[in-house]
């Protein structure tokens, strides 16, 4: 899956489950852009897992600063699941 496809999937998750209507800037703070508090972060994690059919590990969210960080995390999990 390409970065563009992952970014589009994230945009859909944000739109459907976090009521976010804007574009996702790869270099922007994902916490600020999506206005993530602990409950919204949990929603994002669960819906990303469901959408991409991956399993994120406890603590994965701690390495998320930008949207690109989340894209890279999803890509790693997809690659791990493919092995």
Question: What are these model-derived regions, one by one?
Answer:
Residues 2-36, 40-45, 50-83:
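Phosphopantetheine-dependent thiolation modules in NRPS/PKS and related acyl-activating systems
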């Amino acid at each position: 899956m390409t970065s563009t496809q992952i970014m589009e999937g994230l945009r859909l998750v944000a739109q459907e489950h976090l009521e976010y209507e804007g574009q996702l800037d790869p270099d922007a703070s994902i916490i600020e852009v999506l206005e993530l508090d602990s409950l919204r972060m949990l929603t994002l994690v669960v819906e990303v897992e469901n959408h991409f059919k991956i399993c994120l590990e406890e603590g994965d969210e701690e390495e998320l600063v930008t949207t690109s960080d989340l894209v890279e995390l999803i890509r790693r999990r997809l690659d791990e699941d493919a092995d």
